[in-house]
C-alpha cells in the first residue's frame, strides 16, 4: 500500500507540475489596472476588484485557465463592488470565473450585460457566480438586450440574484447558432430570479434557450434548482427552443407565465414546483409543443390559469408547421405529476382554432392534435370539486391515459378512461407542500422506458415502492423550497421597501412641487383644504400618495402649465396615488402623462375619489411607456377634450401601453374624444394581456367628437369586462366593440341613446409572424 | 491465480445457468411445423427450414432470445429455401435471426416483405442475414410496399442481396414513429443493393430513413459498407430524414441518384465512394439540406450530374420552411473529400428559384442560402480542365472556404478564396481509385472539432501526417471496393443473362405466334421474306428480337386482331426489338400496347428500320405501365389515327409512363392525333425525369385531328431535345411548347406551314406538397 501511495503522489505531482500554476492574487482599483491584470493572468490567477463604485466599466475577461486552475475575477467583498453606468462584462476563453459583482444603476452599452463571447472568441467552461444584476434596464422598453447571454459550451450561471428587467429581451438567453455552441451543457443553477414586471408585449421571457431558427440543435442546457419569483414579463417564463434541455427542481412562485417547450424536442421537465395564487389567472404551469418531452414528478399547486396558461397545456399544432410556428405534439410522456387545487389542470388541444379559419390563413390553423403520447400515474387532488379536471379543446384519441387518479371530493366530471376518482387524503407538510396522508395503493402503469423515472419529487427512490403522483413516500421532510437562502448570492438581501409611510403635511403656504420632490419613497403628502396652483409639471419618479387631509373638505390643485404638458409627469418607477382631490386644468393641458421617451421602467397610477376636469387629456400614455396598474375609482372625469388614451403602440407587434386598467364607480361627463382608448395590435395567440374592467360607472354626453364612433375603444385587448354601467346620451355609434373569441364580456349595462354594445367573435388582426 | 480462474469459471457458470439454453435444432418442412417450432422456441433454439419451395408463406417470427443465445431461423442450405407467392416475414420479439432465405417469384400480401414488427409488438436486436429478395414486386407500380421495414431498436440487415424493386415505395425504410423506434442504432451493413430500375416518379428510394413527420427524432441508423449498383429508382438513392444517421464506407456504383440528407440534421457521410460514368448525367453524389451534417473523406469519381444531381449539391432552403419542404443549410462541414474528374463538383444554393416567384407561392421559394458552413481541405483533380469547378447558384458568403486545392490542368476558372490551383499528380491504384502520386504539401485547415476527422478514406490515421483530400498516404493497397464477394450473401451469384442469342428461323409456313411463345429469353426470331398474318395479340414477356432475315427484302406482319388490341402486347419484363419489318394493321388495332393492368415490371421497346402503318395507335402506354427505353430509329410511321401515347399518368403526382423516349431518323406521315404525347404532371423540383429526344426526323401531314393543337406534346417532361427535324404541312398551332426553366432545348429545325415552336420559361404545374 505504501508503494501505491508514493506512486500516486508522484503521479499527482507530475500532472500538477505540467501546468504552470499561478496562485498570486492581484488587487485592482482602476479599469486600467483591471485590464492589465487580465492581460497578465495565467492559470490560477486571482484578480480582486477593490470595493467601491466602478462607473462605465466594460470588462473584457479574456484568458485561458484550466479546469483545476481557473482564472478568477472577484469582488474584494462580495456585493461591495458596484458596477454602474454604461457597463458590461464579456468572457472570451476557458475556465474563467467572475464572483461577487453587483450590477445596478446603469445599463449595458452593448447587446448584453454579461456575455460568454467576445467577438468570435466564444467562452467555454466559464462561470458567473454570486453576482447580482438589478434593474439594469436600457432607457426604453423597445431597446433590446439580454442580461446574461450564453454562447460556447459548459458555461455556468449560479447563485446569482437577477431582477427587474423591463426592457425588451429575455433576461437570460442561450444562443445556439454555430457548432461551437451546441451540445453546450450550460448550467443555470441555484439562482434567484426576482420580480420581472409585465412588459406589455412579447420578448420578456426570464430564460430563453435558442430561437426557432436554431431549434433543431442539441442544446442540453440544464436549468435546475432556481427560484422564479414573480417573473411576470410575458406568457413564457422559460421558453425552451432547442433539444434535450433539462428543467429540474426549479420553483416557480407566483410567476405569471409558464414553462414552455416552444420549439425543439426531447426536453425533460422533472421535479419542479409551480405555486400559484388563489385569485391569479395569469399564473400558468407547463405548456407543451413538439415531440418527445418528458414531464415527470412535477408538483403544481393552486394554479388557476386556463388555456395557454393552464396548469398543463398540451397544444394543438399546425399541420406541417413552418419552423417558427406550432409543431404538433407527439411522443410526449406526462407521468407522476401532482396537481393540487388547480382549476382544470389538464388541457389538451390548447390553441385549437379551426373556428377562426375565416380570419386566418391555413398556415395559422392549429388542427394537428397531440398523438402517440402517454399521460399516466398522475394525481389530482381538489379540496373543492372541479367539474372539468380535464379539458379537451379537440380530439384526445391520440393520448393514452393510464392509471391517473383524482380525489374530486365526489364532484362529478366528464369521465375519462384512465382517470379514476378515488378517495385519499393529503397532509400539509408546509404552507405550500401537500403530500398524501397514506400510501396510495393504486397500480402504477409501466410505460415504455418508465423505469427511467426512478426517483420522485424529493429524490426518493421509486424502486422499492412506486406510487402514482409526484411523491412516493408519505414520510418526507420539508425541503424548504421557499427558503431564499437556498438561492442566489450569499450576500444580497432583497430590499423590502418599508411600508412605514412618512406623512408630510402641506398647506397652501408651502410649495407643493418642492414637497413632492423632497419626499421619500413611499411618502404621503397630505394637503390642507384650499387651492394649490401649479405652473410646471411635477415629475413623479417614486412611490408617493397625494391626498386631502380632510376627505370631506377636498383640496383643489389647479394646473396652469404649458399646453400639452401634464400636471403630473409619470417617470420610470413613478407610482402615484391621488386621493380625495380636485384636479383642474385650463383646457389645454394634460392631467397625467408618461415621459415622451426614456421610460426605462413602468409607472403606476391610482386615482380615487377625485374630480378631474378641464384638461385636454386626463391621461396620455406615450409610445414605449408602460403601466402595470392604472385605476380610477369613485372619481369624476368631466369637461375634457380626451379621456384615457393608452393606444400609442400602433406597430401591431403585440405591444400595448398598460397591463391592468380599472374604472370603477366613476362618472364620465362631457369627455369629447378617446373616452377610453386602449389598443393592442397584432395577431399572436399566445398574448394574453391587456385587461380593462369598467364597472358601476356612468358615461354621459361623451364621445361627441370621437372619429371612430366608439365610446370605449378596446381593439385587440384580450381581457375586457364592461358591466353594471349606465350609458346615457352619448352621441356615438357603438358603446364598445368586443372580441368574442377572447376574454371579452359585458353584463347588466344600461344603455340609453348611446349606440350599441357589439360583440364580434373573430377580430381581424395583422399577422405578426 | 488459480483461485481467480475457478472463481471466474463459477461466475460464468452461474450467469450462464440463469438462462435456460436450448441448443436443439429442429427441422421443419411445412408451414404448420414452422409455426409450431417458433411457438416452442426458447433462447438458443435453431429452426431449420427444409430446402425447397415454400409457397404463400407468412412467417410470424415471435420469440425472445438473448444476446448470447438468440433464436435462429435458417435455411437448410442457404439459397435453397425459396419463399414465393404471397409471402412475407415479420419479427416480433428480441434476439431473433433469419439466415439464408430467398424471396423470389412473388410479392408481399402486406405492406412489407420483411418487417421488424408484428402489430404493436416491435422487434429489438433482431437480424436478417445472408438473404435475397429479388423482383418481389407487387402487381402494379402504384401498389406501395417496403421490402425491409425497420421498427424498434438495434435491428440489423446484413449480407443480403436485394434487387429489382419496381413498385412504389423505398426498398428499405426505417420507421421512427414512437419512442420505441428512436435512438434505434439499426445497422444496414455489407449488403449488395442490386439494380433498381427507374420508377418514373417519386417514392423509389433504395433506403429511406424516417419521414418528414418524424424528422425531429434522433435515429442513429448506420448504413455502412454496402454496395449500391445501378440503384436508379428515383433522384434519391438514400433519403435520410432523421437525425444522427451515419453513412460510412458505402460504394455507390453507377447509380442514378444521390445520397440526400432530405430532412433531419447532424448526419455523418464519411468515407463513401461515388463512381459515375463518363456519359451519364443522372448519376449524382451527395445532396445536402439541413443543419450540422459532416461530409468527410468521401471519394467521388467521374460524376457528371448537375444541379440536384451535382457531385456535391448544397441546397438553398425555404425561409422558415414547413416541416416537409426545404430547411436551410446551416453549420455543415465538408472536409477532406476528393473529386476526381467530376463536372462542376461543388454546387451551392442548388434549387434557388426566386425567378419562379410568379408561378409558385412564397412557401415554395428557396431563397435561404447556406450559412455558418465550412468547406475545407478538399481536393479536386481534373484530367481535363473544368471552367466552373464551383457553381454558386446564389450567394455563398455564408460558406467558409479554407485550404481546398484543385489541379485544373491550368484551365482558368472563377477564382474563389480558399480554392487554390496547384500542381499535383494522381496515380490509378485500380480502375476506379486514384490516389495522389506524391504527398501533397499544402497546409491543412484546422476547423472546430476537425480533430474528430482522425482517419482517411482507407481508415489510415490522420494523426501523424494529415493531408488535404480523402487520402493521406500515397502508399495504399487496393481495398477492392467492387469485389462483389465483399457484399451480400455467401451463396447468391447474380444471374447474368447470357448474351449468346438463340437464332430461330421462321418461314411463312410456321406459326409465328407459337415460335415467339416458345423462344428462350434473348432469342432472335428471323423471318423469311413474305407476309405473316396474325389474328391474336402476341404477348412479349421476355427479351426477344424479331427481324427480317434479309433486310433488303423485308417481311411484312399483318395484324387483324380485335379493335383496340395490340399486335404486340408488352408484358412486365418484355423487351422487344423489331427490326427491318413492315407492320400493318387494319386501322382499328394498336401496333404496341402495355397491359391494361398488373404491369408489375417495366417493358422496353426498340423499333428500327420498320414501317408501321394503318393502326389506331402505334404505341399506347396504359396507366401504371412504365418503360425505361422506347426508341424508334430509321422507321416510318404512317396513316395512323394516333402515334405514340405515353400520357396516362394524369393524377399530377409526378409519375410518368416512360423514362427515355428516342425518335431518330424517322418519318411521321399522316398521324392524325397524339403524334407524340408524353406527359408528366405535378410540381416537384426534385423530379429530374422524362427524357425525349427527337432528331433528324420528318413530320408531315400530321396532327390534323389533335384537339390541343400541339404536334409534339411534352407537357411537364424535364428533358426534351428537338433538333434537326423537318416539319412540313402539319395543321397544328404549335409544333411544341417547351419548358425553358428545365432541360428543354431545340435547334436546327425546319418548320414549314406547321405552327410554331414555343419556349415558356416557367410552366404552371399543380403543387404536389
Where are these regions (language model features)?
Chain A
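Bacterial Sec-dependent N-terminal signal peptides
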Residues: 1-24
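Acidic Gly/Asp/Thr-rich repetitive segments characteristic of extracellular carbohydrate-active
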Residues: 18-56, 60, 66, 458, ...
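Right-handed parallel beta-helix/beta-spiral solenoid domain characteristic of secreted/periplasmic
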Residues: 22-29, 51-113, 133-137, 507-510, ...
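Short sequence motifs at beta-strands and strand-loop junctions characteristic
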Residues: 29, 326-328, 449
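Extracellular beta-strand repeat scaffolds in secreted/surface proteins
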Residues: 45-49, 404-406, 465-470, 523-527, ...
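Glycine- and acidic/polar-rich repeat regions and solenoidal domains
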Residues: 58-60, 85-90, 104-124, 134-423, ...
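Short, compositionally biased
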Residues: 60-69, 118, 476-487, 540-546, ...
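Surface beta-loop-beta hairpin patches that serve as ligand-binding interfaces in beta-rich domains
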Residues: 423, 428-508, 751-769
Amino acid at each position: 500500500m505504501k508503494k501505491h501511495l508514493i506512486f500516486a503522489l508522484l503521479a499527482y505531482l507530475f500532472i500538477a507540475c505540467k501546468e504552470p500554476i499561478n496562485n498570486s492574487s492581484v488587487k485592482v482599483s482602476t479599469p486600467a489596472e483591471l485590464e492589465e491584470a487580465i492581460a497578465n493572468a495565467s492559470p490560477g490567477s486571482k484578480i480582486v476588484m477593490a470595493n467601491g463604485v466602478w462607473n462605465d466599466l466594460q470588462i473584457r475577461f479574456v484568458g485561458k485557465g484550466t479546469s483545476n486552475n481557473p482564472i478568477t475575477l472577484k469582488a474584494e467583498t462580495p456585493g461591495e463592488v458596484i458596477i454602474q453606468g454604461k457597463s458590461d462584462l464579456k468572457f472570451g476563453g476557458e475556465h474563467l470565473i467572475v464572483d461577487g459583482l453587483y450590477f445596478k444603476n446603469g445599463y449595458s452599452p452593448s447587446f448584453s450585460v454579461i456575455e460568454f463571447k467576445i467577438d468570435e472568441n466564444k467562452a467555454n467552461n466559464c462561470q458567473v457566480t454570486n453576482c447580482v444584476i438589478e434593474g439594469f434596464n436600457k432607457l426604453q422598453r423597445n431597446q433590446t438586450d439580454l442580461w446574461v447571454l450564453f454562447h460556447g459550451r459548459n458555461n455556468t450561471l449560479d447563485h446569482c440574484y437577477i431582477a427587474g428587467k423591463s426592457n425588451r429581451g429575455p433576461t437570460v438567453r442561450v444562443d445556439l447558432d454555430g457548432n461551437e455552441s451546441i451540445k453546450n451543457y450550460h448550467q443555470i443553477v441555484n439562482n434567484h430570479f426576482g420580480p420581472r414586471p409585465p412588459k406589455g408585449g412579447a420578448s420578456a421571457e426570464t430564460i430563453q434557450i435558442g430561437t426557432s431558427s436554431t431549434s433543431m440543435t442539441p442544446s442540453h442546457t440544464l436549468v435546475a434548482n432556481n427560484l422564479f419569483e414573480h417573473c411576470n414579463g410575458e406568457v413564457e417564463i422559460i421558453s425552451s427552443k432547442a433539444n434535450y434541455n433539462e428543467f429540474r427542481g426549479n420553483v416557480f412562485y407566483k410567476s405569471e407565465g409558464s414553462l414552455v417547450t416552444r420549439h425543439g424536442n426531447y426536453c425533460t421537465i422533472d421535479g419542479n414546483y409551480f405555486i400559484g395564487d388563489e385569485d391569479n389567472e395569469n399564473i400558468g404551469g407547463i405548456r407543451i409543443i413538439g415531440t418527445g418531452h418528458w414531464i415527470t414528478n412535477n408538483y403544481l399547486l393552486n394554479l388557476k390559469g386556463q388555456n395557454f396558461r393552464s396548469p398543463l397545456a398540451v397544444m394543438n399544432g399546425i399541420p406541417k408547421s413552418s419552423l417558427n410556428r406550432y409543431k404538433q405534439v407527439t411522443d410526449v410522456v406526462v407521468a407522476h405529476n401532482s396537481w393540487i387545487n388547480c382549476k382544470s389542470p389538464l388541457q389538451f388541444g390548447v390553441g385549437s382554432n379551426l373556428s377562426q379559419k375565416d380570419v386566418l390563413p391555413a398556415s395559422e390553423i392549429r388542427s394537428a392534435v397531440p398523438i402517440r403520447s402517454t399521460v399516466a400515474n398522475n394525481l389530482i387532488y381538489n379540496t373543492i370539486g372541479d367539474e372539468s379536471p380535464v379539458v379537451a379543446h379537440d380530439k384526445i384519441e391520440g393520448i393514452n391515459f393510464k392509471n391517473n387518479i383524482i380525489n374530486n371530493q365526489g364532484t362529478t366530471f366528464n369521465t375519462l378512461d384512465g382517470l379514476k376518482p378515488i378517495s385519499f387524503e393529503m397532509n400539509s407538510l408546509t404552507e405550500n407542500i401537500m403530500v398524501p396522508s397514506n400510501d396510495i395503493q393504486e397500480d402504477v402503469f409501466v410505460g415504455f422506458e418508465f423505469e427511467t423515472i426512478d426517483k420522485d419529487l424529493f429524490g426518493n427512490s421509486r424502486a422499492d415502492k412506486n406510487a402514482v403522483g409526484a411523491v412516493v413516500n408519505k414520510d418526507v421532510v420539508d425541503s424548504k423550497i421557499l427558503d431564499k437562502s437556498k438561492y442566489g448570492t450569499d450576500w444580497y438581501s432583497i430590499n423590502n421597501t418599508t411600508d412605514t409611510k412618512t406623512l408630510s403635511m402641506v398647506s397652501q403656504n408651502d410649495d407643493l412641487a418642492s414637497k413632492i420632490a423632497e419626499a421619500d419613497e413611499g411618502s404621503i403628502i397630505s394637503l390642507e383644504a384650499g387651492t394649490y396652483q401649479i405652473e410646471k409639471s411635477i415629475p413623479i419618479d417614486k412611490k408617493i400618495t397625494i391626498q386631502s387631509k380632510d376627505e370631506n373638505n377636498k383640496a383643489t390643485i389647479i394646473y396652469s402649465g404649458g399646453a400639452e404638458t401634464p400636471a403630473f409627469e409619470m417617470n420610470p418607477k413613478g407610482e402615484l396615488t391621488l386621493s380625495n382631490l380636485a384636479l383642474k386644468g385650463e383646457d389645454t393641458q394634460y392631467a397625467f402623462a408618461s415621459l415622451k421617451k426614456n421610460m426605462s421602467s413602468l409607472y403606476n397610477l391610482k386615482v380615487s375619489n377625485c374630480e378631474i376636469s378641464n384638461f385636454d387629456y386626463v391621461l396620455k400614455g406615450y409610445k414605449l411607456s408602460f403601466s402595470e396598474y392604472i385605476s380610477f375609482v369613485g372619481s369624476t372625469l368631466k369637461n375634457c377634450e380626451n379621456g384615457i388614451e393608452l393606444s400609442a403602440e400602433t406597430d401591431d407587434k403585440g405591444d400595448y401601453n398598460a397591463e391592468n386598467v380599472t374604472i370603477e364607480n366613476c362618472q364620465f361627463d362631457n369627455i369629447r374624444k378617446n373616452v377610453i382608448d386602449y389598443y393592442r395590435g397584432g395577431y399572436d395567440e399566445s398574448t394574453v394581456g391587456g385587461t380593462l374592467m369598467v364597472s358601476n360607472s356612468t358615461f354621459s354626453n361623451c364621445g361627441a367628437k370621437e372619429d371612430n364612433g366608439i365610446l370605449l375603444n378596446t381593439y385587440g385587448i384580450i381581457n375586457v369586462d364592461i358591466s353594471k354601467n349606465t350609458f346615457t346620451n352619448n352621441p356615438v355609434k357603438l358603446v364598445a366593440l368586443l372580441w368574442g373569441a377572447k376574454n371579452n364580456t359585458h353584463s347588466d349595462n344600461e344603455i340609453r341613446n348611446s349606440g350599441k354594445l357589439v360583440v364580434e367573435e373573430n377580430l381581424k388582426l395583422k399577422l405578426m409572424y
